[in-house]
């Protein structure tokens, strides 16, 4: 076993054992922020050839304007892979209770998949924008072209399938949004689908403060609703919803059970439609 492997396993033990490690680290005094103003976070609990290859593809696409990070959900069976040395930002289930507020339910799924981003933001809050991309998202085109398409889009929250209550009144997660003393009528709530999204520094700060204030809920209703209520600007990658810009209708994804972006069923691979986001890809 090499010295680096020993170091990684030691880190893994500290993470799982509760000692202070990378997942709870804060910026060191005097550390200079990255000159790039955007962070691109690739979120995964899986480490294999396909996942690493996709992370590399995205990293190459954003290298001129963003700093990539591999957000790894570390568990006892997480494999060591030296190819990710120095690029992993690890976290464990313990972050769900480590930020002075708790999740809607005591697990990342369902509905708390934004907690790794909130944890990262608490550590590295100097970026202006944050992209979050789940490991099973693919783009059937040039990732660089995709990111460049939104460089000038001034939105605090850029995601997919944004809809109002009237668009899908029977959606099961509307009632999950709650607060001990405050109430937002379901008719004024928004939903979104967030396997990939971009969010501003100010919006993340507001979400953190909202959680500390007592708001909880599935993040697909919590994020868009609380941001719109506070006057933040929302935008959609494509699709057919009322918040989609006319020139982006169905441009980067299609909706529905037969669409390119959906909760299920799984796609075996990205395609055959060109320049579209696909989720979920489960040939892993």
Functional labels for PLM-detected ranges:
Residues 48-52, 76-81, 168:
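Short, charged/polar "capping" segments at the starts of alpha-helices
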Residues 127-136:
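Short beta-strand-to-loop acidic/aromatic patch adjacent to the donor-nucleotide binding site
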Residues 210-284:
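C-terminal catalytic/acceptor-binding lobe
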């Amino acid at each position: 076993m090499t010295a680096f492997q020993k170091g990684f396993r030691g880190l893994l033990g500290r993470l799982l054992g509760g000692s202070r490690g990378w997942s709870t680290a804060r910026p060191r005094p005097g550390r200079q922020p990255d000159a790039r103003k955007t962070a691109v976070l690739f979120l995964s609990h899986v480490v294999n050839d396909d996942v690493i290859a996709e992370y590399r593809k995205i990293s190459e696409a954003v290298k001129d304007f963003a700093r990539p990070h591999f957000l790894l959900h570390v568990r006892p069976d997480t494999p060591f892979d030296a190819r990710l040395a120095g690029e992993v930002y690890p976290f464990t289930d313990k972050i769900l209770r480590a930020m002075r507020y708790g999740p809607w339910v005591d697990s990342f799924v369902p509905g708390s998949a934004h907690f790794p981003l909130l944890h990262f933001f608490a550590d590295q809050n100097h970026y202006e924008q944050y992209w979050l991309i789940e490991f099973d998202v693919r783009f059937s085109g040039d990732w660089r072209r995709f990111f460049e398409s939104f460089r000038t889009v001034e939105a605090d929250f850029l995601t997919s399938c944004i809809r109002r209550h009237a668009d899908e009144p029977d959606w099961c997660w509307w009632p999950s949004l709650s607060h001990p003393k405050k109430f937002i009528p379901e008719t004024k709530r928004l939903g979104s689908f967030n396997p990939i999204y971009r969010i501003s520094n100010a919006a993340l700060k507001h979400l953190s403060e909202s959680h500390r204030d007592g708001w909880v809920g599935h993040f697909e209703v919590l994020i868009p609703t609380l941001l719109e209520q506070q006057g933040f600007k929302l935008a959609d990658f494509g699709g057919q919803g009322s918040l989609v810009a006319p020139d982006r209708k169905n441009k980067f994804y299609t909706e529905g059970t037969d669409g390119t972006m959906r909760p299920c069923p799984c796609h075996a691979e990205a395609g055959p439609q060109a320049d579209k986001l696909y989720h979920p890809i489960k040939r892993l």
